[in-house]
């Protein structure tokens, strides 16, 4: 079965006959916009004139690329955000869009999620990001941009410090993309937030990204949830966290860090004095990994939120984490999420007692009780709807 990017290539080769429909719609859109713009131009003066020039340029580019214009772009009237998600633009549509985005002085946030950009569309947009000094927030999620498209985007961002937030969820990025991401982390000091969730970054990617995270000097929020980080790659990435002095929010949930990765995270927490929020939900961490993670919690003074729910750490692991926090007089922890973990009464009692010792700490727990325990001790939340928490 062909993917959207392969289908797009075939559609681009169908010839002029297939372009007749879009051409006609483009001309109709241009006539409609021209009629509406005259009165607006009289009211807006030179500001309206600038927008009219850009709109005219966009319409011409749409005709040249045989695509139907996006009406909301023609009527944006200096809006700071352009939301075109789920529009099916494809590479040709983005090429037409690039003509106006390059010199647009208004748009700060660009949302192109789920538009089938593929590599060619990403390359066209990269030229925009290279030249535009206004756009600071970009969402390119679910576009299958691939390694080649990512390389073009990362190269452009390295030359433009204006972009502070980039979302690249669900682009099927694999280990080949890791080297481009590492280069981005090393050379783009203006980037503050990067979302790489729902991709296919694996062990090798973790080994490449770890040193880059250690050297990064700007990123404050990183989302790597729902990837394939495990084994040596997860450990290498965790070690990179030790030297990082900027990252405040890290989401590595739904990976496979396991006990070795949890141990490395624990080591990082012993020396890292910047990280504030950490999500390790569903990472195959057992009792051993939880206890080693706890060693970091015994001395860490900055972590405010730790989510370790849905890991098989059992009661012993939960008790170990709770005792580590209790024994740290300088702990900044405000939320410890150990929900969806089967625990004993000892763990429940310890968690309850800690509310008196550390009133500022919220311990989130949904406890799957053993059948032979009294019904009266069953928590109020039903077993059929366990709590699901994320950063």
From Swiss-Prot:
Sequence ranges of Basic and acidic residues compositional bias: 28-38
Gene3D superfamilies: Ribonuclease Inhibitor
InterPro entries named among the record's database cross-references: Leu-rich_rpt (IPR001611), LRR-containing (IPR052394), LRR_dom_sf (IPR032675)
Assigned keywords, A-Z: Leucine-rich repeat, Repeat
Spans annotated as Disordered: 1-38, 371-391
Pfam families: LRR_6
Domain of life, per lineage: Eukaryota
SUPFAM superfamilies for the chain: RNI-like
Entry keyword annotation includes Magnesium: no
Repeat positions for LRR: 106-126, 134-154, 162-182, 190-211, 218-239, 246-259, 274-294, 302-323, 332-354
Record field: compositional bias (Low complexity): 374-391
Name of the molecule in the record: Leucine-rich repeat-containing protein 74B
Gene that specifies this protein: Lrrc74b
């Amino acid at each position: 079965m062909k993917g959207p990017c392969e289908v797009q290539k075939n559609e681009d080769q169908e010839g002029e006959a297939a372009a007749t429909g879009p051409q006609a719609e483009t001309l109709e859109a241009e006539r409609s916009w021209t009629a509406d713009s005259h009165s607006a131009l009289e009211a807006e003066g030179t500001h309206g004139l600038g927008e009219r020039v850009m709109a005219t340029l966009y319409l011409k580019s749409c005709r040249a690329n045989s695509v139907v214009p996006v009406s909301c772009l023609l009527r944006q009237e200096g809006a700071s955000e352009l939301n075109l998600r789920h529009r099916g633009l494809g590479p040709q549509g983005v090429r037409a869009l690039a003509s106006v985005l390059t010199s647009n002085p208004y748009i700060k946030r660009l949302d192109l999620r789920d538009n089938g950009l593929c590599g060619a569309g990403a390359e066209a947009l990269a030229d925009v990001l290279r030249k535009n000094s206004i756009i600071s927030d970009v969402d390119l999620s679910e576009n299958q941009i691939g390694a080649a498209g990512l390389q073009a985007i990362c190269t452009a961002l390295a030359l433009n410090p204006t972009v502070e937030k980039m979302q690249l969820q669900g682009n099927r990025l694999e280990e080949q993309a890791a080297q481009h991401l590492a280069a981005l982390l090393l050379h783009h000091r203006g980037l503050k937030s990067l979302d790489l969730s729902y991709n296919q970054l694996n062990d090798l990617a973790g080994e490449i990204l770890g040193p880059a995270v250690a050297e990064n000097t700007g990123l404050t929020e990183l989302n790597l949830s729902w990837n394939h980080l495990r084994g040596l790659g997860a450990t290498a990435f965790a070690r990179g966290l030790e030297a990082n002095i900027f990252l405040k929010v890290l989401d590595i949930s739904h990976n496979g860090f396991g006990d070795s990765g949890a141990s490395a995270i624990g080591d990082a927490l012993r020396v890292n004095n910047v990280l504030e929020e950490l999500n390790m939900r569903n990472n195959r961490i057992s009792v051993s990994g939880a206890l080693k993670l706890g060693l970091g919690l015994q001395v860490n003074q900055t972590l405010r939120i730790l989510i370790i729910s849905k890991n098989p750490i059992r009661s012993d692991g939960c008790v170990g984490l709770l005792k580590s926090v209790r024994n740290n007089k300088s702990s900044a922890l405000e939320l410890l999420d150990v929900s969806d973990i089967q625990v004993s009464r000892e763990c429940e009692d310890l968690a309850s007692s800690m509310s008196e010792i550390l009133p500022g700490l919220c311990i989130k727990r949904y406890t799957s009780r053993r059948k032979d325990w009294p019904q009266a001790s069953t928590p109020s939340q039903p077993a059929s709807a366990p709590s699901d928490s994320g950063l």
